[in-house]
């Protein structure tokens, strides 16, 4: 795992104690979520509690970078915190290098702010450790009580503004999705997106029917100014095919994930 390898490569031996505490705190936490806000607090809280435990500042690359770029990071996080696109924030050491894992930094700062603004420090620690990450409202209440953001957060507007920038699938070619008379001689399938896409990331999976219904043999690459993905396919006559395009990795060049979590491509040959 390159991400994990990079994490340890950037740690000194002095940080091993902190890492052990960080991982132990994870065993005491409740729930999980694929939303940037929830997962960032979940990770950052482990760093903050570890720092309280060892009674000295922890030193990591993301904390150092984060503190030196606080304003711009906070603004970007606010735009993306209600999304499920981790690309700019978590587990991205193999792509982002020095500005990787900044969700840890933001989560740490949110927890630190919550703690500093709490009159009862013991209760604050309990709140941080026992926060239920499956409960979006509880996580949002925690954020608001932390006073990490000075201004009021308009969740509806943030989500609306983010979704305006998300790419979507316009169509597939050379036949329409769910067609039932596709020529089995076809060797290419094209997916057309609404925006120029990041060509480094793909997330295509089997449908519930599994491997036998999966027609793709290879990802050929992008064309049409990176708005069209070309897939090589191998088809047989009178057979159903289907697969799922997900937003786990597909994103625009601006870093916005696909608006649909899953898009099923389904068709049948003649």
Model-derived regions, located:
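Sec-exported extracytoplasmic/periplasmic mature domains
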Residues: 25-33, 50-58, 112-119, 198, ...
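Acidic, low-complexity Ser/Thr/Gly/Pro-rich repeat segments typical of extracellular/periplasmic
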Residues: 160-270
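Short, Φ-rich (hydrophobic/aromatic) sequence segments
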Residues: 75-77, 110-111, 193, 241
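Acidic/His-rich structured neighborhood in mature extracellular/periplasmic domains
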Residues: 1-63
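Soluble non-cytosolic domains of exported or imported proteins
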Residues: 10-15, 19, 36-40, 97-101, ...
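Extracytoplasmic/secreted envelope proteins and their assembly/folding machinery
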Residues: 21, 43-50, 108-111, 125, ...
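Short helix/loop segments within enzyme catalytic domains
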Residues: 52-79, 119-123
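Pan-zinc metallopeptidase signature
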Residues: 78-173
């Amino acid at each position: 795992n390159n991400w994990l390898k990079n994490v340890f490569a950037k740690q000194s031996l002095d940080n091993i104690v902190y890492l052990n505490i960080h991982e132990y705190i994870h065993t005491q936490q409740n729930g999980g979520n694929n939303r940037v806000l929830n997962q960032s607090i979940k990770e950052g809280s482990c760093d903050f509690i570890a720092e309280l435990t060892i009674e000295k500042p922890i030193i990591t690359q993301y904390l150092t970078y984060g503190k030196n770029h606080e304003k711009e990071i906070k603004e970007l996080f606010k735009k993306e915190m209600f999304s499920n696109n981790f690309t700019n924030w978590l587990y991205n050491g193999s792509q982002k290098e020095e500005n990787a894992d900044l969700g840890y930094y933001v989560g740490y700062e949110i927890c630190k702010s919550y703690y500093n603004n709490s009159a009862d420090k013991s209760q604050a620690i309990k709140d941080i450790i026992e926060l239920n990450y499956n409960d979006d409202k509880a996580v949002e209440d925690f954020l608001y009580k932390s006073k990490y953001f000075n201004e009021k957060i308009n969740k509806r507007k943030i989500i609306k503004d983010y979704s305006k920038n998300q790419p979507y699938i316009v169509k597939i070619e050379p036949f329409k999705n769910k067609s039932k008379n596709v020529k089995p001689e076809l060797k290419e399938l094209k997916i057309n997106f609404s925006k120029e896409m990041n060509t480094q990331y793909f997330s295509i999976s089997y449908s519930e029917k599994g491997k036998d219904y999966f027609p793709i043999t290879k990802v050929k690459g992008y064309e049409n100014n990176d708005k069209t993905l070309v897939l090589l396919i191998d088809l047989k006559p009178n057979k159903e095919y289907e697969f799922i395009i997900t937003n786990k990795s597909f994103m625009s060049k601006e870093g916005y994930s696909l608006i649909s979590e899953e898009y099923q491509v389904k068709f049948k040959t003649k």
